[in-house]
Design a protein with these regions (language model features):
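N-terminal segments that cap or nucleate solenoid repeat domains
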Residues: 22-70
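Ankyrin repeat structural motif
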Residues: 43-51, 76-84, 109-118, 142-151, ...
Length: 226
């Protein structure tokens, strides 16, 4: 009889423990859902409150986006800063293979880029095209972003993406050759860009510059090869 009673007591205690654990998990899930929603709405104060209550900074939504990734997509610097200060992982990539560092570099979101670098972003991670943050930044002519990447990270200036393009190549092929792009080319070369790396078809940056009639860029490339 005693053993049976003891067994029943243990069972009740176990079930109570399970119930409490389930309640905690339910509460945490609710907080994480609220955190994602608050980030989406750019409600920074609510985000901060939820973080103080213990919400998981690295929870992901149905698209694999963390709250920090959502804030980055919206260029919401204030919320991004709060999330990073709370320990958000800046290297987590979503289903599109974007992460805060990669996307901020590609879109020219300078302030968020700096925050991710300060938080230990991995510059070797690549996007869905196999490119580093430097490649799209060079295409778009984001001078400040390019300088930040080249001077504050160990990013590979000669990394080749899936198309066979380096940052230098992309800055030629996908640009209009204006003064900003000329500055980009010069900046990349000053930081070790190899002007002779061809694309997957064996076409060099110089040949592409000539094909686009980018005379000033052609001069820069020729001067580098002297």
């Amino acid at each position: 009889m005693f053993k049976k009673t003891l067994s029943m007591i243990c069972c009740v205690i176990f079930l109570q423990g399970c119930s409490q654990e389930q309640e905690v998990k339910k509460e945490m899930t609710s907080m994480e859902t609220a955190l994602l929603a608050a980030t989406e709405k750019q409600e920074t104060n609510t985000v901060i409150l939820l973080l103080k209550k213990g919400a998981d900074t690295n929870i992901t939504d149905s698209k694999g986006r963390t709250p920090l990734m959502i804030a980055t997509y919206k260029n919401d610097v204030k919320t991004a800063k709060a999330l990073i200060e709370a320990g958000a992982d800046v290297n987590i990539q979503d289903d599109m293979k974007n992460n805060p560092f990669l996307y901020a570099g590609a879109e020219g979101y300078f302030d968020i880029l700096k925050l991710t670098i300060d938080a230990g972003a991995d510059p070797s991670l690549t996007n869905r095209y196999g490119g580093t943050a430097l490649i799209p930044a060079s295409e778009h002519g984001y001078i400040d972003v390019i300088k930040e990447l080249l001077t504050r990270t160990t990013i590979d200036v000669n990394h080749v993406n899936n198309l066979g393009w380096t940052a230098l190549m992309e800055a030629i092929v996908l640009s209009n050759g204006n003064e900003t792009q000329q500055q980009v080319i010069q900046l990349l070369i000053e930081h070790g860009a190899d002007v002779n790396i061809p694309d997957n078809d064996g076409v060099t940056p110089l040949e592409h510059a000539r094909a686009h009639n980018f005379e000033e860029i052609e001069k820069i490339l020729l001067a580098t090869n002297k």
